[in-house]
């Protein structure tokens, strides 16, 4: 949540407007939560990030993982809303699917047997971490602007 908060406050202060910031990441249980907040900087490209993560997971049987999304709305220095959402799953042994980006080809959603990259956008939006975070944001926005 801290990164979303930092981003939202910085943009709101710079623009003088309300700001919504997102910070998302993939946490892998066997790797102590890595790549976590460093998900986008874990390697230099999506392909290299996937290869690195799969290589680091080779010695582990535990492939549990979770995508998390933190959303923050700020006005100047004031944080107005903070919510988060997540989606649990497993890291596959090899990439599957053509849709999405980032770690989507190796993140298999718990109970569904398919990766984010095998899903269409609408399905991913409904069950994914960002979609879940925005589901929590909606009622908070209604309260804020009531």
Segment roles from a protein language model:
Residues 1-146:
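Anionic-ligand binding patches
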